């Protein structure tokens, strides 16, 4: 019979998320290490620079910082890879309030049936490219591409307390970029949704 008591001398169960505090501090922008690094790196010349740690991307200092792992991050080139590689090394995550953008091509199956595979692949790549540029411009991160869908996330560390407004602005910008703001038909039929709430963000 399980009494719920731990046998004397037995070890406690390991913490399933030992890095939660670190993740939370980084995701909500309160991590002291980033604050110290930013204080040092912002004095190095070389615009543009990482929006999180202020590492320069341009000039001689930018070349040096690239050698140190501070090259632009592919998922959002306004930030450096070093700011996110740390999280890759420490598996875990934290529940934080964040905003998400979901965008997909409406009627993609019918659309694909009406063109060659190469033409549809080109159209899909164009959609991905536009979505990435819109997310980057509004302090979002590309969370993932799933078929004809793009998912973006807006966290406090990057978009600050305005992450819901940033997600909404990105949604509007994506609709405009795909031609939904004019009198004619859009070059790509896209649907966009935004949600804000507490979510587990991590690896």
State the predicted function of each range.
Residues 1-51:
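A broadly conserved sequence feature marking short terminus-proximal activation segments
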Residues 28, 89, 180-183:
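Charged, solvent-exposed alpha-helical segments that act as regulatory interaction surfaces
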Residues 40, 100-106, 171-186:
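Hydrophobic transmembrane alpha-helix bundles
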Residues 34-142, 146:
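Juxtacatalytic helix/coil linker segments
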Residues 123, 127, 166-170, 174:
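Hydrophobic alpha-helical membrane-association signature
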Residues 134-166, 177-203:
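Catalytic core of nucleotidyl cyclases, primarily class III adenylyl/guanylyl cyclases
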């Amino acid at each position: 019979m399980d009494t719920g008591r731990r046998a004397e001398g037995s070890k406690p169960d390991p913490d399933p998320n030992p890095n939660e505090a670190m993740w939370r501090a980084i995701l909500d922008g309160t991590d002291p290490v980033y604050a110290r690094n930013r204080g040092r790196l912002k004095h190095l010349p070389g615009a543009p620079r990482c929006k999180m740690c202020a590492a320069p991307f341009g000039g001689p200092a930018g070349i040096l910082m690239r050698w140190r792992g501070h090259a632009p991050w592919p998922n959002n080139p306004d930030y450096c890879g070093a700011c996110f590689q740390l999280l890759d090394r420490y598996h875990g995550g934290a529940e934080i309030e964040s905003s998400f953008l979901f965008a997909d091509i409406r009627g993609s199956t019918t659309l694909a049936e009406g063109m060659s595979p190469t033409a549809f692949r080109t159209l899909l790549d164009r959609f991905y490219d536009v979505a990435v540029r819109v997310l980057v411009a509004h302090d979002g991160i590309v969370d993932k591409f799933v078929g004809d869908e793009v998912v973006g996330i807006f966290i406090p560390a990057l978009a600050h307390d305005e992450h819901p407004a940033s997600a909404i602005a990105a949604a509007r910008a994506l609709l405009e970029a795909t031609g939904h703001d004019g009198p004619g038909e859009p070059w790509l039929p896209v649907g966009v949704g935004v949600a804000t709430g507490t979510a587990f963000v991590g690896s």
